[in-house]
Curated annotation (Swiss-Prot):
<dbReference type="GO" id="GO:0000987">
    <property type="term" value="F:cis-regulatory region sequence-specific DNA binding"/>
</dbReference>
<dbReference type="GO" id="GO:0005829">
    <property type="term" value="C:cytosol"/>
</dbReference>
<dbReference type="GO" id="GO:0050769">
    <property type="term" value="P:positive regulation of neurogenesis"/>
</dbReference>
<dbReference type="Pfam" id="PF10390">
    <property type="entry name" value="ELL"/>
</dbReference>
<dbReference type="InterPro" id="IPR019464">
    <property type="entry name" value="ELL_N"/>
</dbReference>
<comment type="similarity">
    <text>Belongs to the ELL/occludin family.</text>
</comment>
<keyword id="KW-0539">Nucleus</keyword>
<dbReference type="GO" id="GO:0061351">
    <property type="term" value="P:neural precursor cell proliferation"/>
</dbReference>
<dbReference type="GO" id="GO:1902166">
    <property type="term" value="P:negative regulation of intrinsic apoptotic signaling pathway in response to DNA damage by p53 class mediator"/>
</dbReference>
<dbReference type="GO" id="GO:0045944">
    <property type="term" value="P:positive regulation of transcription by RNA polymerase II"/>
</dbReference>
<dbReference type="GO" id="GO:0010717">
    <property type="term" value="P:regulation of epithelial to mesenchymal transition"/>
</dbReference>
<keyword id="KW-0597">Phosphoprotein</keyword>
<feature type="compositionally biased region" description="Acidic residues">
    <location>
        <begin position="243"/>
        <end position="260"/>
    </location>
</feature>
<comment type="subunit">
    <text>Component of the little elongation complex (LEC), at least composed of ELL (ELL, ELL2 or ELL3), ZC3H8, ICE1 and ICE2. Component of the super elongation complex (SEC), at least composed of EAF1, EAF2, CDK9, MLLT3/AF9, AFF (AFF1 or AFF4), the P-TEFb complex and ELL (ELL, ELL2 or ELL3). Interacts with AFF4.</text>
</comment>
<dbReference type="InterPro" id="IPR031176">
    <property type="entry name" value="ELL/occludin"/>
</dbReference>
<comment type="function">
    <text>Enhancer-binding elongation factor that specifically binds enhancers in embryonic stem cells (ES cells), marks them, and is required for their future activation during stem cell specification. Elongation factor component of the super elongation complex (SEC), a complex required to increase the catalytic rate of RNA polymerase II transcription by suppressing transient pausing by the polymerase at multiple sites along the DNA. Component of the little elongation complex (LEC), a complex required to regulate small nuclear RNA (snRNA) gene transcription by RNA polymerase II and III.</text>
</comment>
<dbReference type="Pfam" id="PF07303">
    <property type="entry name" value="Occludin_ELL"/>
</dbReference>
Amino acid sequence: MEGTQEALSGKMRLLFTPAARTSLLMLRLNEAALRALQECQQQQVRPVIAFQGHRGYLRFPGPGWSCLFSFIVSQCGQEGTNGGLDLVYQRLGRSGPNCLHCLGSLRERLTIWAAMDTIPAPLLAQEHLTEGTRESESWQDTGDEPEGHPQLAPDEVSDPLASHHEQSLPGSSSEPMAQWEMRNHTYLPSREPDQSLLSPASQKRLDKKRSAPITTEEPEEKRLRALPLASSPLQGLANQDSQEGEDWGQDEDEEGDEDGDSRLEQSLSAPSASESPSPEEVPDYLLQYRAIHSTEQQQAYEQDFETDYAEYRILHARVGAASQRFTELGAEIKRLQRGTPEHKVLEDKIVQEYKKFRKRYPSYREEKHRCEYLHQKLSHIKGLILEFEEKNRGS
């Protein structure tokens, strides 16, 4: 992206029939996303992409870091009624004029920016965390830890998009990408109204929910639009607040209990399922926040969003940092065979750490549930605001 670019020159050759199963997109991304892509290319690891209609996420994996970016797919702007954009690449000829190949028309644009919901690895983002977050992390570094059991370094940040069947991807980085995301997490470029790339029938349904065009935004509006409409990232963390987790500290003397051993491994290694309310338990925010019909109502919703979002960020950092440790231990014990001395040593270590964790962070469960509740509430409010803006677009 840096440096001067030479002007394209040469003979033009038109190739308006792209290869089968090939889509041509205009890519817009900030410096952090570009560097992450370049790093993945150098380390030969594959990014993970997930679509949610005309929105989605890109995750760049690696040991010790994991960077999450959001993206939207929108329609490319056209110059005039008959204007358009074509994808052209230049082939430098050793002899004779250069050749310009037109691969086809660009109808969609992929805009990438850093996602707010990325949970940075605690050791990499320690300088960026608040004092309250550091206190929540300190449980794993203090106390009566038995000697001979070194601390496990974090391997990878929990993936908020992966299902419980997916495995972490390998990779490495010379510069922690989590720090790039922390520096760029408020970046959100201007963009055209969103468009769907699904079937025509699906596109008609999604056209009604496109985001309004954004020219200039206040900081709070940037933060509002940076919160993805997705499931809570905390739902992918280890389910250490389950009933099985409550039994770890009580059953530590039952060394021969295979059921308890299996229960322990399952609780640590398997991410918790999505917690959706039952039909009779309708969340209060669904009753309180309904469709927006006026600008004053929109402003009131945005004020409520900002108030809850400040609390959400604090809880998210505290809970994410504390849960990361058990996510790592869960992945570690899953790789060991049950009944082996190594498995037993790690199991005892987990029991001891969990007992210390409960003493140093007694409010973890309440804060975790509160954080997940706020995430769903903020996503709901954001959706209503964007829907109202879309209805008033162009009026």
